[in-house]
Amino acid sequence: MPPSDSPILDDIKSAASELIDPVLDALGGNPWPRRLINACNAAYMISDRRLGSSLPLLEEAGMQKGTRPLVFVSGIHDVHAGFVCRTDDDGLLVTFRGTLPPEDMIFWRWAADWLHDAQTVPMPWTVGERDYGQVASAFGIAVSSLARDLLETLETLNAGSASAIRITGHSKGGAMACLGATLIREQYPDRRIEVCSFAAPMTADQDFIDCYDRDGLLARTDRFQNALDPVPYLPGGPDIRQWLDGEKRLDEAKKLMLVEDAIKALPEWPYRQFGRLHFLHEEDGRIQDDEDAERAAWDAVINAVVKMRFREMIDAHSGVQRYLTALSPDEGEAED
């Protein structure tokens, strides 16, 4: 859970400040990714069906002044959660909470969430009466359990007249954002829907991606991946197995750490990554989103494995200390 004094992003006060902001420049002047990571971090503060002391983060996320977020939860110990709020451009922001961190004050709630995430077997995904491919059951069950409350909340906030509906999440929340987007698209086919995930694991198979594309969602889906973060390669799929099989850099590691046996033992999951990748480089904070970004992200993780930088790989997944910092204009002011 992010601390109450989590580092937050500087306000975007004028067009002039945007011109000298390297993060905004790298994102084509789009302020929403940095707003959305604030929303993701705010979601970790959901407790007792409330958002507690998250107001500063929500203001940074672009929540409309004078409004309040509406929270929805489900599951044992409310392990699945999210919120919807109005934004300052008359849109709506849907945020799904990620997996609770070990620092969560309630041990059983944290344990229940992690055990739920271990359900990686595929399950069919249905939107309306349409077969929508297969998804990882942990995320499918989570979104299905929240669907009714989510759609009722959107109706309460008059989503049909929103300028845009933006959907986001960090980690598990990023996977849920993509699944939730399909249900929201079904309910609001004429609304502009944008999806942005941070550190999302692999979520769905190629049939899902094809349906997602036909619904016009793929072209408006972005995903951010931090250098060294291994979670976007979990729980695995055909692309990952193929990449691992061809990795000569792992030859020594395979001998030392039985990595080769682990690769052979990987289940044949059908999951694939999708959406436009924005890769956050470790050395200079550069944001890469060209055709070579996938390779650069993979190289960073494999090199970290070979060098046994496991502690740093765990830290790389943090929404506050890594993703927020990478998208902050003044990195020197954000705690690492």
Which residues does each PLM region occupy?
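N-terminal low-complexity, Ser/Thr- and acidic-residue-enriched intrinsically disordered segments
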Residues: P2-D88, R97
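Short, flexible loop/turn elements at secondary-structure junctions
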Residues: A43, V73-I76, D88, G98-L100, ...
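Lipolytic serine-hydrolase domain surface
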Residues: D205-D336
